Amino acid sequence: MKPIVKWSGGKTDELKRFEDYIPSDCSTFIEPFAGGAATFFHVGNQFENKVLSDVHVELVALYRAIANGKSQAIYDFMKSHANDEKTYYEVRSWKPEDYVDVASRFYYLRKTCFRGMMRYNKNGGFNVPFGRYKTYNFEDIINEEYYNILKDTIILEKSFDYIFETYNDSSNFVFLDPPYDSVFTDYGYCSFGKEEHVRLSNFFKTTKNKCLMVIGATDFIRELYDGYIHTEYEKKYRFKLHSGRVGDEINTTHLVIKNY
């Protein structure tokens, strides 16, 4: 299964680079930084128990709605809301309270916003412009495979601190795909800087959980996880600009880090 929504830094194209390091002797899969949850959807069904967590309220609402059998309601919302600029900004300005409405709004915006970007203003409002894409696919939302895996998953809106404090057993496999070490630390819906990275590394080094992390390489991260870096690989990115032109290729190095 591919991710339900596009997510910056998603690992769909990199799974083959690290999936062989996923342990086969663990019964519980845990992902504290869910995002698009590419790894969860790829290997989650191999585990008896599954825990998916993120601090992004709308993302968690989407996963919970699907798990609770509300996919059809989201699909109906998509069918009844046009892919045009007027409708887009009406939906973007809407502030629903019911979690299924929150999930529907979020899914619509993820499918129709520019380049699937995730950007918020200082007040926490989503401020990505309309994408102007002629076609987009939302049929996947009613794919029963998503319901089947999510209905058997504990879905949490919790920080990584909570996850490590709550789950601490050698039978747990924790996949970590945290925000990268970057000068950009405020994501609108959360902040994640060097202080958080240090805290995460302390959990990583002291927990009983078997942890596998994939993260962009920086001197800070290399120093933080010295002795735990198993391998590394090159990753190339190329973004499509608003003008339609393809941007310059960006080369990065990703580290595969594990504590077992």
From Swiss-Prot:
One of its GO terms (biological process) is DNA restriction-modification system. It catalyses: a 2'-deoxyadenosine in DNA + S-adenosyl-L-methionine = an N(6)-methyl-2'-deoxyadenosine in DNA + S-adenosyl-L-homocysteine + H(+). Its EC number is 2.1.1.72. It is an enzyme of class 2 (transferase). InterPro entries: Ade_MeTrfase_dom_2, DNA_methylase_N6_adenine_CS, M_m6A_EcoRV, MeTrfase_D12, SAM-dependent_MTases_sf. GO terms for molecular function: S-adenosyl-L-methionine binding; sequence-specific DNA binding; site-specific DNA-methyltransferase (adenine-specific) activity. Pfam families: MethyltransfD12 (PF02086). PROSITE patterns: N6_MTASE. It comes from the Viruses. Keywords: DNA-binding, Methyltransferase, Restriction system, S-adenosyl-L-methionine, Transferase. S-adenosyl-L-methionine binds at residues 7, 11, 54, 177. Belongs to the N(4)/N(6)-methyltransferase family. This is Type II methyltransferase M.CviBI. The lineage of its organism: Viruses, Varidnaviria, Bamfordvirae, Nucleocytoviricota, Megaviricetes.
